[in-house]
Amino acid sequence: MKNLSVFVAIFCLASLLGCRDGEDLPSTDFSITFKATYGGETLEKNKDYTFGNYPIFFEGCRMYISDIRLVNAEREVIISDVEYLDFTPENAVSATPSILFKNVPEGDYTSISIGYGVKPQLNARRPSNFPAGSPLSIEIDYWAGWKSYIFSVLDGKADPDNNGTKNLSFSYHCGSDAVYKVFEFNVPIKVKAGQFTTADIAFDMKEFLTNDDGSLYDMVANPATSNDAANVVVAQALTAHWGRATSITQ
């Protein structure tokens, strides 16, 4: 009788987990197009924008996101463990990468959850642990000294003196487990088997550089993140803005 009770408990747990990840449901392909913007306009490399009352341009904009989940009252479906997004590749002024997620269970999802950076379980590893082509095999965005991936990069120049010379270089390279942050966005996402489903996610760098009270981030006082692994104050402050800087539509 005791063995029967254990079997029933295991069966119920397995059934619950199956419902949670949606493996028992019809599925379809789901594509997300990602875009970096500035004030709602597609961000382009080396193009002048206005930051407050002075000009600014961007030289590099790329980021990791991980543990992407579709959520409703019945289940949470992990559609990706990690993705790498380069919005300013070497051979183009801008890019809007589209990623296809296969076999996504159908459902009326009420929110999407995104981890900004590389989640700790994966961040504990290093590029040599992954095969070529994996988002985590990229050496350029890994700090060996910190034992961490660089979660997001935003580089550029600005002219806070408005004298015609962009003499302020800014470099925001955010990383380490202490900086990783998850946001959940209450946006309806409908996925129906047999129908190709799409969504768009935009990351606005103007909002990323804006404080919660509406004031602009003090780029003159804090033009860069620290090289000291113990000092993540700037990185944490900026990463906290991703929730407001992200917009999702379907």
Which ranges hold each PLM region?
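C-terminal motif of bacterial Sec signal peptides marking the signal peptidase cleavage site
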Residues: 15-18
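A short, solvent-exposed, low-complexity linear motif enriched for acidic/polar residues
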Residues: 20-250
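Positively charged n-region of N-terminal signal peptides that target proteins for export
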Residues: 1-5
